[in-house]
Structures are given as structure tokens and as C-alpha cells.
Design a protein with these regions (language model features):
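Extended beta-strand/beta-hairpin segments
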Residues: 4-76, 84-165
Length: 165
């Protein structure tokens, strides 16, 4: 496994990107937050020009299990960021990726009030002409460059598997 123990510094000439979202609570059932069980945890995440994402709390906290909760969104962000960097590095190094799937997992310790571990488990299929050892090694570069992993305050481990077509 590759562990998130890389310190990232930003060059002085690096471009700054800005992101804007709106989270709108849609769970007022008529009496607002008059008491703990009087309201729904449902909300909508919005961003200009994008499809809305229905959200709620984890079902353990009275959330709707059919909607994305913040913990799942955080895990999905870590997984997607790693995947995007991995594909970038593969393209740069002549590795042809044909398929990529990550069944990522996260652990949250309620007493600690934070995520305590994220485990990415990418399963990658590469072309027969691609080097599987290099394809595996490029997960380290992707992890090093992943903005989300570099932002998180919990270990992010990578348990990658490479298969040739």
C-alpha cells in the first residue's frame, strides 16, 4: 500500500482555482427545527451548469439512505481525484488504460469526530502492450499529486490491482 505521507508545497507561480457550490436545505417539514425529529436532513447540492446532487445525512443520523451523505461525497472525491491523476500519468508514460474501477472504503470514528482512514482499491485493466509494473508504480505519482488526498487529515492508502487485457 502507498500511504499519504507526502508533503505538497505550492510553487509561487501556481494558478489559484476557485470553486462555488450552493447547499440548499430542503427538509423543512413545516415547523423548521422546532425539535430534533421535526425536520428532514435532505438538501440539494448545486453548482452552475451542473446536475444537482441530492444529499442528506448518513442514515445513522436520521438521513435518507437513497441520497448521498457528506462522508460518501468525501470518499468519492478522493477516489475520483486519484483516478484523474492516475489516468494523466498513464497517458504521459505510454500506459493504455482500458478500464478503471475503484471500490473505495472509508472509516469514520464517531468519538473522534472525523474520518480515520480512506482506502482506495483501484482495479485497472491495461492493454497487453503496456507495462504492468510501471502501471502499478504510477499509483504512487497519482497519490502524490492528488489535491484531495493532500488536503485530508487521515491516512489514504492505495491497494491497487493491475490486469492486462
Amino acid at each position: 500500500s502507498i500511504r499519504n505521507n507526502i508533503t505538497r508545497t505550492t510553487p509561487m507561480t501556481a494558478k489559484t482555482h476557485h470553486y462555488h457550490t450552493r447547499t440548499e436545505w430542503t427538509g423543512n417539514l413545516g415547523v423548521g427545527t422546532a425539535h430534533y425529529t421535526a425536520y428532514s436532513r435532505d438538501h440539494i447540492h448545486r453548482a452552475p451548469g451542473k446536475a444537482n446532487i441530492p444529499g442528506s445525512a448518513d442514515p445513522a443520523y436520521r438521513g435518507d439512505p437513497a441520497r448521498w451523505n457528506p462522508e460518501e461525497l468525501l470518499l468519492a472525491a478522493a477516489s475520483a481525484c486519484h483516478k484523474l491523476w492516475y489516468l494523466h500519468h498513464c497517458a504521459d508514460h505510454g500506459i493504455t488504460v482500458l478500464a478503471y474501477r475503484d471500490d473505495a472504503e472509508a472509516e469514520m470514528n464517531e468519538a473522534a469526530g472525523r474520518m480515520t482512514a480512506i482506502r482506495l482499491k483501484p482495479r485497472v485493466t491495461i492493454s497487453a502492450a503496456s507495462d504492468p509494473a510501471l502501471a502499478l508504480a504510477l499509483h504512487h505519482d497519482a497519490h502524490r499529486d492528488c489535491y484531495i488526498a493532500n488536503t485530508l487529515n487521515c491516512p489514504v492508502t492505495i491497494d491497487a490491482h493491475i490486469e492486462q487485457a
